[in-house]
Amino acid sequence: MNNNFFNSDFDSILRRMMQDMQNSNQTSNKKYYINGKEVSQEELAQFTQQGGNHSAEQSAQAFQQAALRQQGQQSGNGNYLEQIGRNLTQEARDGLLDPVIGRDKEIQETAEVLSRRTKNNPILVGEAGVGKTAIVEGLAQAIVEGNVPAAIKDKEIISIDISSLEAGTQYRGAFEENIQKLVEGVKSSQNAVLFFDEIHQIIGSGATGSDSGSKGLSDILKPALSRGEISIIGATTQDEYRNNILKDAALTRRFNEVLVNEPSAKDTVEILKGIREKFETHHQVKLPDDVLKACVDLSIQYIPQRLLPDKAIDVLDITAAHLSAQSPAIDKVATEKRISELEHDKRKAVSAEEYKKADDIQNEIKSLQDKLENSNGEHTAVATVHDISDTIQRLTGIPVSQMDANDIERLKNISSRLRSKIIGQDKAVEMVSRAIRRNRAGFDDGNRPIGSFLFVGPTGVGKTELAKQLAIDLFGNKEALIRLDMSEYSDTTAISKMIGTTAGYVGYDDNSNTLTEKVRRNPYSVILFDEIEKANPQILTLLLQVMDDGNLTDGQGNVINFKNTIIICTSNAGFGNGTDQEYDDIMQEMKKFFRPEFLNRFNGIVEFLHLDKDALQDIVNLLLDDVQVTLDKKGITMNVSQDAKDWLIEEGYDEELGARPLRRIVEQQVRDKITDYYLDHTDVKHVDLDIEDNELVVKGKS
């Protein structure tokens, strides 16, 4: 076997190796390689036998051809389908699929398209989360049960991952070869139906450009689809169907569209009941009927940007997972081992006549046995409606509460809470409170916002402060307030700051700071349009739709829901100087600045009155309370005499400017002087504020 590649030394090495193999009884740990390929002992022996009659090149080539034949046999067309796909029909036979409820119509339409002689390719079109994949799983279950036309009663639905067809195809022609193997596999099986989720990905999939001559997946499949040699079920969204599939007319006519709409709330509850058992078994959590209904109702109310049943199922799954984590499963092995140890200790105690100790050990054994018994097949936790509310709060940040007795009392008292913060504006507070009570109690009509109000009046009387307090009272923090200063929206291009720019303009892809995007991210918000009279007329035109229909379409075509927002517009224009003006006077005055159709959209137009000195007495107390909150961080208490309060009111009172001068006086005379005193006496624990010689003085105690 002497040649350019091997010499006699290699022959001797090979003979010794074969002799060692024969003499050794332990062959399981030995591996043999030829040309980088792992081979068995028999293949190696065959190779050595051929070595005397053939050259090394011929022997290596023969071995490679044999290996390729073996690989081809192992990856036959039928097996190729199994390698890259899931057999949904087989999973249905094995009971691995969730039950599909309320989709009989869509399943029937899909089955009818599949039973056609040609162009038997249904495509399920619907928004994300409505259950397109579930319909295909329902069809697989219907095939197993025999509730389908005779033409497809023996079909096997194979779910194909498109990425698996592209994996490893680094050389030209490899992708096309995979597709041909797929098509041949379907032809040879004669009963396979391929299911492509996100089927829009087949457009251009595998193509490397027009100059390379490499075709994409859709181009390769078109002839087989039109002749009925291969049957495909597709699933995609409305947008992807319009932007990808419909642009290819030849591909579109080979598919038959099956529309999949969002199920109703009632159907979604039935869907949750159908899958409840699997979730209970998985999480070991009991899920009563009222919890299922709460999942649907609260997800509809607080997660409007997603669709049923997906969002309701997610809420149910997250809640059960959270409860399961709070009640971890008992470690059965460790517990049984501990019981065995305690039994041994008990016997020793009895032998030593330590009966009290033995009794204590027996009680511990009984406790562990009870835990084992309760955890063996039993649900360790029971979900409640309150748990669903907590899940919604974690997902959205909205403090969700149910209409229980405490919440009813809270709604009743909302006006008194607001009046304690907004001084001297009882009429405005009461009007806003009525709108909120009506909405939270569920007596609103249509899809309009919770409330829309126009606050008019002089500066510094509490218009903006009422909006802030509403955000805190309803949604828990000031971050729920979206404040827009209309002086920034006075030019003709300001509308792009509201809804974003349209296609073809700069900034089309970046709408992150627009009003519509802020509301989409935080659907429960108080929207404040400050000094609305300064806004461009186009802004007011947009607000007509928001206040009437409760939605707004942004520059990218997305419909944003404003149903759960409170819209407040403020204006300094046309307010009266008197304190006893009637509603008709305000409306008549506002018509000088705003169009009648704009004013007519508001739930209420409220005049904020000038503040008198009695109102400032309550306001100064609120401002001093804010100072005390700051001092609490330093561990300092504060006492302010009545003379000091009267002095602050006298210095800060201005009927035309409202409460803002008083805020400045408190900042300059109280905060600044306490700061100066603290810097000189860092160990101070208490400060007293009083008037001496018509001047505010600060005295402290350590």
Swiss-Prot record:
Region annotated I, chain positions: 81-332
An example Gene Ontology CC term for this record: cytoplasm
Biased composition (Polar residues): 46-55
Entry annotated with the keyword Magnesium: no
Protein name (Swiss-Prot/TrEMBL): ATP-dependent Clp protease ATP-binding subunit ClpL
Name of the gene: clpL
GO biological process per UniProt: cellular response to heat
Lineage: Bacteria, Bacillati, Bacillota, Bacilli, Bacillales
Sequence ranges of Low complexity compositional bias: 56-74
Keywords linked to the UniProt accession: ATP-binding, Chaperone, Nucleotide-binding
Family: Belongs to the ClpA/ClpB family. ClpL subfamily.
GO molecular function: ATP binding; ATP hydrolysis activity
II: annotated span: 383-575
